[in-house]
């Protein structure tokens, strides 16, 4: 059994270099919520050095709140902003002789696109128009995955090790109780349930089915590196291969 393990990088965390030795995929911030040209270049070089697949991590234009502010923007604006961010990273990747593999929206752009078909359509169209060979990463079972499929993109359904789930398979909003899982044992058990059994227990106690093709671990967590190592060990013990 194979699973992709991904993390967001280029967001100002000192642990990026070490994290890139533990994951199989990296989502590189493109400047709208965090990062800049220099951090993008550094992350691309580190990913190439470690043989890690990497992609663009576009966001709403929201550096003040790390891309976590809800916004209502015309789909055409989201399309243009997504293209702009993918293109910025793409230029750096090309100059370094690499190949960008995927696009994964960030923060509130990701969460809103999971439920809003018009927003999801704008993102999927931008990815397709930039490079139809790119993989579109989105919340498992979401509108973003469906939009990617409509554009005949390869999609990757994502689950989260350290986030709480609602009964409909969506993530618990960050401002609500149960949004973040701080207990390492609980996060590990949830991840293994999603990967091996295709199910997740919601904060209300209801089990719901989920397709886990890639697991996100957040690199800005206090114990991110230790948890990443433990998760890798748990996968190895169960003959689950971490591969992009």
Curated annotation (Swiss-Prot):
InterPro entries, A to Z: Glyco_hydro/deAcase_b/a-brl, LamB/YcsF/PxpA-like
Enzyme superclass (EC): hydrolase
EC annotation from Swiss-Prot or TrEMBL: 3.5.2.9
Keywords linked to the UniProt accession: ATP-binding, Hydrolase, Nucleotide-binding
Reactions performed catalytically: 5-oxo-L-proline + ATP + 2 H2O = L-glutamate + ADP + phosphate + H(+)
Keyword Nucleotide-binding: yes
GO BP term, example: carbohydrate metabolic process
Similarity field: Belongs to the LamB/PxpA family.
Function: Catalyzes the cleavage of 5-oxoproline to form L-glutamate coupled to the hydrolysis of ATP to ADP and inorganic phosphate.
Known partners and oligomeric status: Forms a complex composed of PxpA, PxpB and PxpC.
Protein name per Swiss-Prot or TrEMBL: 5-oxoprolinase subunit A
């Amino acid at each position: 059994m194979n699973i992709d393990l991904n993390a967001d990088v280029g967001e100002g965390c000192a642990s990026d270099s070490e994290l890139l030795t533990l994951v199989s995929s990296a989502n590189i911030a493109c400047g709208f919520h965090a990062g800049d040209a220099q951090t993008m270049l550094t992350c691309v070089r580190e990913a190439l050095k470690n043989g890690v697949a990497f992609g663009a991590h576009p966001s709403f234009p929201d550096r003040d709140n790390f891309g976590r502010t809800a916004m209502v923007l015309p789909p055409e604006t989201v399309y243009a902003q997504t293209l702009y961010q993918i293109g910025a990273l793409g230029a750096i990747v090309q100059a370094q002789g690499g190949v960008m593999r995927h696009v994964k929206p960030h923060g509130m752009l990701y969460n809103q696109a999971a439920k809003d078909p018009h927003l999801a359509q704008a993102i999927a169209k931008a990815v397709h128009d930039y490079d139809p060979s790119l993989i579109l990463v989105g919340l498992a079972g979401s509108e973003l995955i469906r939009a990617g499929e409509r554009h005949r993109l390869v999609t990757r359904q994502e689950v989260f090790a350290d986030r709480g789930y609602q009964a409909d398979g969506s993530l618990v909003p960050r401002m609500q109780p149960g949004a973040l899982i701080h207990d390492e044992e609980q996060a590990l058990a949830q991840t293994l349930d999603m990967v091996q059994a295709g199910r997740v227990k919601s904060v209300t106690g209801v089990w719901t089915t989920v397709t886990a093709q890639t697991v996100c671990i957040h690199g800005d967590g206090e114990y991110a590196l230790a948890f990443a190592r433990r998760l890798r060990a748990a996968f190895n013990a169960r003959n689950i291969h971490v591969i992009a």
